[in-house]
Design a protein with these regions (language model features):
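Glycine-rich, charged/polar anion/phosphate-binding loops
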Residues: 69-75, 125, 162-164, 193-199, ...
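Helix-rich terminal scaffold detector
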Residues: 23, 30-37, 198-327, 331-337
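Generic structural signal for well-ordered, non-membrane alpha-helical segments
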Residues: 33, 37-41, 54, 58, ...
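Intrinsic disorder/low-complexity segments
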Residues: 1-23
Length: 382
């Protein structure tokens, strides 16, 4: 049976380590109802709200999400602007066949022409300079010969407004240029600067703490014993946050499978964070303490287990306006649940308009069989 995979994970972005073996506790009910994927995603998004807005200088707002529209404070361009170095003339003179003009001066960008340019006269003009009233065509300097005070132009089919970027051609005064909910990319920062938006309202940074749980984990620089593995999940997550200027992420450490140690670490993370992400310890093993510890910390569970693979044991809860995610310890599960649950929640808290990840539909390279009813995520190469 062929089926279409509508969600992809980039193999190159995943940590390549062996996942810990999960020993299931028979005392735990394995028949916890699985929430369908779409309902699980919707439950997460219903539970989170955009954070408050702050006003920042434009140069500090790159990458943040706008909370107000950016509108043009004047037409752009604000005047008829020469698009070429050349000679500004009246189109009516060209239409009559006139090609030899008396040049009355030179106008550079950043200056205004104070005199008059009468019929039969022209003005030498630089790129970016304002074209004086009454002149409505510019001929390139390459198509001219200067003869003392006179200039002869060589043009066969002159058009009105040729080589002139007309006033308001890009936008009108008051026109919305950037919508609230858009991220301030470099090009949008340039647009905001062009219309004088020196300070902008953006969602304040989402404060995130990442905690790795598991007695089998050691730091990246450590020499692991044969029964230990290096913590790659937190490195993966922290690297993802480097891509998000609107998120301020910190690492809460690697915590062993000890309820008291976990409670101390997660309580501290909750105090300083808008979102806490903990990896590992959310399944049904005897040492999977995260759900109970989070309950003791006052976190109300809103989602436990979704009908997906990998990532079925995903856990989500809230404490007031704070969001808490418990992600399964398998690295591919971390990547999948981060993309499908954590990232949309982060985007909503940051004030983004579009929060769900994009879907790219491509044909499979080979037939794939699916023997279960779960929404399945598979690693792909990009």
């Amino acid at each position: 049976m062929r089926f279409r995979i509508s969600h992809r994970l980039d193999r190159d972005s995943l940590p390549c380590i062996n996942a810990p073996i999960i020993i299931y506790n028979p005392r735990v009910d394995k028949n916890v109802a699985l929430t369908p994927f779409a309902k699980a995603q919707a439950a997460v998004l219903r539970a989170v709200k955009p954070l408050p807005a702050v006003r920042l200088p434009l140069e500090q707002a790159f990458g943040f999400v706008l909370r107000e529209h950016i509108r043009a404070d004047r037409p752009l361009p604000p005047f008829n602007r020469s698009a070429m170095d050349g000679y500004a003339v009246r189109h009516a003179d060209l239409a009559k066949g006139l090609r030899r003009f008396r040049c009355v001066g030179t106008l550079e960008a950043g200056a205004a022409w104070r005199g008059a340019v009468r019929p039969g006269e022209c003005l030498k003009i630089m790129t970016g300079a304002p074209v004086p009233p009454g002149l409505d065509a510019v001929e390139q300097v390459e198509k001219s010969i200067s003869d003392g005070p006179h200039v002869e132009l060589f043009t066969d089919a002159p058009e009105r407004w040729q080589h002139i970027h007309r006033m308001g051609a890009d936008c009108k005064k008051g026109e919305r240029l950037i919508a609230a909910g858009e991220t301030l990319t470099p090009s949008r920062v340039a647009v905001a600067a062009a219309v004088g938006a020196a300070r902008v309202a953006v969602t304040r940074a989402v404060r995130v703490t990442v905690v790795a749980s598991g007695s089998e984990l050691v730091g990246v620089a450590a020499a692991p014993a044969p029964y230990q593995i290096r913590d790659s999940n937190s490195r993966f997550l922290m690297a993802r946050f480097f891509e998000m200027p609107w998120a301020a992420a910190s690492f809460g450490g690697v915590i062993p499978d000890d309820p008291r140690a976990l409670r101390r670490a997660l309580a501290a993370a909750l105090k300083r964070s808008d979102m806490v992400i903990v990896t590992g310890g959310v399944s049904m093993g005897e040492r999977d303490h995260i759900p109970e510890v989070l309950k003791q910390c006052g976190v109300q569970n809103r989602l436990y287990k979704s009908a997906i693979r990998p990532g079925k044991p995903v856990w989500f809860g809230v404490k007031g306006a704070k969001a808490v995610f418990g992600l399964p310890g398998n690295p591919v599960s971390v990547a999948a649940t981060f993309r499908e649950f954590v990232l949309p929640a982060l985007r909503k808290m940051a004030g983004c308009t579009a929060v769900l990840p994009s879907v790219l539909r491509l044909p499979l390279a080979a037939p794939a069989k699916k023997k279960h009813a779960l929404r399945e995520f598979r690693v792909s190469r990009s």
